[in-house]
Amino acid sequence: MPKKVLIVDDEPSIIVPLQFLMEQNGYETGVAFSGEEAMETISVSHPDLILLDIMLPIIDGFEVCQRVRENPEWNDIRIILLTAMGSEANIAKGLALGADAYITKPFSNSEVIAKVKELICQ
């Protein structure tokens, strides 16, 4: 049974190549274009890992990360923040809120897939 990866970003130009990359590596994918949509998708599909942008409409990625970590039913979900917000303060905040990893844009496909594999052991 393939592992599920939820890709959360408001830019289709980011989502499409990430979705292709994940599927080429054997992962089932889901997509959300906002933090609000991400929360709904997480509650329905319970992904194994979330690739999460920070700058999202309505509910930002930091808040999504925090909400996931506050729900004990979702303790097993791994979170990678994948964002252009690469300042040390943002990295520290993301990790403090419970993200498992923080990758800054622009990123390499090999960097992303290596981190995904590391976190969900596939």
Spell out what each predicted region is.
Residues 107-116:
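C-terminal output helix
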Residues 12-30, 119:
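Two-component/phosphorelay signaling modules centered on CheY-like receiver
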Residues 32-33, 58-59, 68, 85:
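Hydrophobic residue at a beta-alpha junction
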Residues 15, 57, 75, 87, ...:
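The feature encodes the CheY-like receiver
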